[in-house]
């Protein structure tokens, strides 16, 4: 459907020449036929599963490649961006020269020239005042399918005068042979130019680079306008009460916000402005490893026609083995948000959040399943962003390792972490919001805290019973822990009880406390950061 009659001439403006044909904003039926075309080879080819969803493989790139991320350093970004080569903070915002950018752009536009291309126009951001109009250009049908699922699909009327604010050119099939001379990490690249407002992708087929690329852009633009930009899921209760769930990949954002008792706003990326919380996306990107119909029925039932599975094992009879992590632990599915029945309609936005939940998967088994945070502890734990990096969401990670990721999303932050903390705190104070730290990870038994217990904890937060519960303080971390909660095994609330002896917990807790203190040193170069030290662990 060529609503705005995009022509090869239009693509010439981006340096893409001699385009054979443009498949503009293809329907799901068109994408289905394109992906299953028997003439396709390699990673372009989709496989039909018995659930109705198409499955694709993304090759060796089964997660993002943060070491291959670059941003052009110019007058727009020089003094605003959080650069990897400045300050104490560790991040992936490596500077790129204008010359190298032009070389990468030439590679991608050459790759896309002379081809039959898929062009998808979509929105990033459910708030019309601040959303980005994004044009995605790719030669691969399933990549067009991915962005159609994940971003907000414009109406026919909105497409008539669609003018892109940002262009994403995906040249997954091309690589950069001159990477060594240019001082880059590898032949693959995910590069941004915030002056030209273009993202380039080369070498990696992973769909998540397009999703998280736009998240990085929103993370640059919104906080500068005083709008919180958050790596979180969000939902709303029957009384209009909004909760947001911060957390890194695999900590439970999608699972815990997909709740039959509450309507989903979104599962991963949100803004918080003067009107309330709004989704950046039009879809969900759920992990499927060990997915079961019983434990996560909403996500399981969302995997049907128009959903797109990534890197799962499909048996000869078309059934999916969700337990098989042989390709990667980071198996995924993208689906349009309306595949979940219980969502906020027609626009994925709601009022101001009153509950802010920080999800962590503690591989040490030290932190309690839930604690109520003071205002200073809220800032401390937001800036710390502690979790265990779970297997598979980045290449080369197979065992859980502790990690600190500022604002529970350092990989996607374009500004200094304190800028996100300042905006979030202002929004929380204005809304009278309360924060909680929820450990969805392990305890002294060596087992992961069950989804059943975690869901009961979330229920207690959302219905207010946790705020009324009697609490005690956990030593070292000074966290307020409830003595009992409805539906939760009381023995697990105090993590010390899950160890053979309190000394075992003390030993592990001391080791983790040291890591927290070392990590937070990077924020102590400002008076505001120094003031927060007392909100962290004390040895």
Swiss-Prot record:
InterPro entries, A to Z: PEP_carboxykinase_ATP (IPR001272), PEP_carboxykinase_C (IPR013035), PEP_carboxykinase_N (IPR008210), PEPCK_ATP_CS (IPR015994)
Binding site for ATP: 212, 231, 247-255, 296, 332, 448-449, 454
Catalytic EC class: lyase
Gene3D superfamilies, per the entry: 3.90.228.20, Phosphoenolpyruvate Carboxykinase, domain 1, Phosphoenolpyruvate Carboxykinase, domain 2
Substrates-to-products reaction catalysed: oxaloacetate + ATP = phosphoenolpyruvate + ADP + CO2
Residues reported in the UniProt entry to bind substrate: 64, 206, 212, 332
One GO process term, biological-process aspect: gluconeogenesis
Binding annotation for Mn(2+): 212, 231, 268
Main location as per UniProt: cytoplasm
Assembly behavior: Monomer.
PANTHER family named in the record: PHOSPHOENOLPYRUVATE CARBOXYKINASE (ATP) (PTHR30031:SF0), PHOSPHOENOLPYRUVATE CARBOXYKINASE ATP (PTHR30031)
Family per record: Belongs to the phosphoenolpyruvate carboxykinase (ATP) family.
Protein's UniProt name: Phosphoenolpyruvate carboxykinase (ATP)
Species of provenance: Salmonella arizonae (strain ATCC BAA-731 / CDC346-86 / RSK2980)
Gene: pckA
């Amino acid at each position: 459907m060529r609503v705005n009659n995009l022509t090869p001439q239009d693509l010439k403006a981006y340096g893409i020449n001699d385009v054979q044909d443009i498949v503009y904003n293809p329907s799901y039926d068109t994408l289905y036929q394109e992906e299953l075309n028997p003439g396709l080879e390699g990673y372009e080819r989709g496989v039909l599963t018995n659930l109705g969803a198409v499955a694709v493989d993304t090759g060796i790139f089964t997660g993002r490649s943060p070491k291959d991320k670059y941003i052009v350093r110019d007058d727009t970004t020089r003094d605003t961006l959080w650069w990897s080569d400045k300050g104490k903070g560790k991040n992936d915002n490596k500077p790129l020269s204008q010359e190298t950018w032009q070389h990468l752009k030439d590679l991608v536009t050459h790759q896309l020239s002379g081809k039959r291309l898929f062009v998808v126009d979509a929105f990033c951001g459910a708030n019309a005042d601040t959303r980005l109009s994004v044009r995605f250009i790719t030669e691969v049908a399933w990549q067009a399918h991915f962005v159609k699922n994940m971003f907000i699909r414009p109406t026919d009327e909105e497409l008539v005068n669609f003018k892109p604010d940002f262009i994403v050119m995906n040249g997954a099939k091309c690589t950069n042979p001159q990477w060594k001379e240019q001082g880059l990490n590898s032949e693959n690249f995910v590069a941004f130019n915030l002056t030209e407002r273009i993202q380039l992708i080369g070498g990696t087929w992973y769909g998540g680079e397009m999703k998280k690329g736009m998240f990085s852009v929103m993370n640059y633009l919104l906080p500068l306008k005083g709008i919180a930009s958050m790596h979180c899921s969000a939902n709303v209760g029957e009384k209009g009460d909004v909760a947001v769930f911060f957390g890194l990949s695999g900590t439970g954002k999608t699972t815990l916000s997909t709740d039959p008792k509450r309507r989903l706003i979104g599962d991963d990326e949100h803004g918080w402005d003067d009107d309330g919380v709004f989704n950046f996306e039009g879809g969900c990107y759920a992990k499927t490893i060990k997915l079961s119909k019983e434990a996560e029925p909403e996500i399981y039932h969302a995997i049907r026609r128009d959903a797109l599975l990534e890197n799962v094992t499909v048996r000869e009879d078309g059934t999916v083995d969700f337990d098989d992590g042989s390709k990667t632990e980071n198996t995924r599915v993208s689906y349009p948000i309306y595949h979940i029945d219980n969502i906020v309609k027609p626009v994925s936005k709601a009022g101001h959040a009153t509950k802010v939940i920080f999800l962590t998967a503690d591989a040490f088994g030290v932190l309690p399943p839930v604690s109520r945070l003071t205002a200073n502890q809220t800032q401390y734990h937001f800036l710390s962003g502690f979790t265990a990096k779970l297997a598979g969401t980045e290449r080369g990670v197979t065992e859980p390792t502790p990690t600190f990721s500022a604002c529970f999303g350092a990989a996607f932050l374009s500004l200094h972490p304190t800028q996100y903390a300042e905006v979030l705190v202002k929004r929380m104070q204005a809304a009278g919001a309360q924060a909680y730290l929820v450990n969805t990870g392990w305890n002294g038994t060596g087992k992961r805290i069950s989804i059943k217990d975690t869901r009961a904890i979330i229920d207690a937060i959302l219905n207010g019973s946790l705020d009324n519960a009697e609490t005690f303080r956990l030593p070292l971390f000074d966290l307020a822990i409830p003595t009992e909660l409805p539906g939760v095994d009381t023995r697990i609330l105090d993590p010390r009880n899950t160890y053979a002896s309190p000394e075992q917990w003390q030993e592990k807790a001391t080791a983790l406390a040291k890591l927290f203190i070392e990590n937070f040193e990077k924020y102590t170069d400002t008076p505001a950061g120094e003031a927060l030290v007392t909100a962290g662990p004390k040895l």
